[in-house]
């Protein structure tokens, strides 16, 4: 379930069909996020996940600011029946491009 930022970047560069999930607030997302990420705050994940993330077997890469909220979101997704969740911590440790 936990991977490094480097492993997440490698997946983003070499695979297709994954989702990057930003578990921060919309305001934080608007200030800067990993390219291609969608935002569902960790507080809204149980209400919005099944509407937005329709394939429970799709690879979902989850991050937040420091890693705490991404862990909460990843655990919530697993409890909802999602099977392919990779949590890679916080954007503060992301050494790659943001937008």
Predicted regions located by residue number:
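Active-site flanking residues adjacent to catalytic metal/cofactor-binding acidic residues
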Residues: 21
């Amino acid at each position: 379930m936990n991977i490094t930022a480097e492993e997440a970047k490698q997946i983003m560069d070499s695979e297709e069909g994954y989702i990057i999930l930003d578990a921060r607030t919309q305001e934080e997302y608007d200030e800067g996020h990993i390219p291609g990420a969608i935002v569902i705050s960790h507080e809204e994940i149980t209400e919005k996940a099944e509407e937005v993330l329709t394939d429970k077997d799709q690879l979902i890469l989850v991050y937040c600011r420091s890693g705490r909220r991404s862990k909460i979101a990843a655990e919530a997704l697993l409890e909802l029946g999602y099977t392919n969740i990779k949590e890679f911590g916080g954007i503060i440790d992301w050494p790659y491009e943001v937008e």
